Every structure is written in C-alpha cells, then in structure tokens.
A protein has these predicted regions:
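Adenine nucleotide-associated cytosolic modules
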Residues: 1-137
Length: 137
C-alpha cells in the first residue's frame, strides 16, 4: 500500500489581461450605472462614495472617475494617484443639463486637474450652488 499523497488538483494559471486595464472609480448611483456599462472583464471597479483612498485602487493602465459635479476633492485625489503612478486619468461629471467629460490628465504631458480648474474659474465658471448640489446628490 502506497503512502504517497496524490498531487493537488491542477488549477488553471491566472491569465494576463488581454488589453489595457481601466480602474473605474464611481461615486453615486448614476456613476455605478455608467460603470456597469463601460467596464470590461479585466477592468476593476472601486466605489469612491466615501472618498478616494489610493491604496484601495489596484494598479491599472488608466483611471476613470465618474462622479457628481464639482467633486474637487475627488478630482485632486485622482490627480495625486495619477501622478504618483504615472497613469492617465479622466473625469466624467453629470450636471443638470450636461454630461462633462474631461479633462484627460496625462502625467508629464498635460495640465493637472487643479490647473485646469483654476483656468476654468478664471474665465467665469462658477460651481453649482450648494442647494442644487444637495438636490442632485
């Protein structure tokens, strides 16, 4: 009688992603609905309803934040993540009358979100009043 143990069942080796991996960062119900439609099988989804913590975001080729309007804190946190990891990032915001996509931030090649926001305000942009933001959120 043999006392050797049988080999463990063969497990399939983890597969490398077939293309670029996107980290989707949704904030709110609208964002989660959008991300459900956009995310591919290799992409990761990390909800940021309570803030963006970079250690919770796995490494990816790019990041997309989908959020309510004027989430400057989230956008600045995304900038920090983008520049620290050297990955492009994009923001998508739902306003009452429009859907705003951008800016695309490419570390070392384009302006950061803070610079974009400062320039936008210089030309007359005003954030939504707090009561409108509260009604949307």
């Amino acid at each position: 009688m043999s006392t050797t143990t049988p080999p463990p069942a063969a497990r399939p080796a983890p597969q490398a992603p077939s293309g670029p991996v996107t980290a989707y960062l949704p904030q709110g119900g609208f964002a989660r609905a959008v991300v459900r439609r956009l995310a591919g099988p290799d992409d990761v989804v990390v909800p940021v309803d309570h803030g963006l913590v970079s250690t919770f975001v796995p490494y990816a080729d790019r990041a997309v934040l989908v959020a309510d309007p004027d989430q400057t804190g989230l956008r600045e946190d995304l900038d920090a993540l983008s520049f620290t990891r050297g990955m492009p990032s994009l923001g998508l915001e739902l306003f009452p009358t429009e859907l705003r996509c951008g800016p695309l931030v490419v570390p070392g090649r384009s302006a950061c979100y803070r610079c974009y926001d400062r320039r936008r305000r210089q030309h007359g942009y005003r954030p939504l009043p707090p009561e409108v933001s509260a009604e949307l959120g």
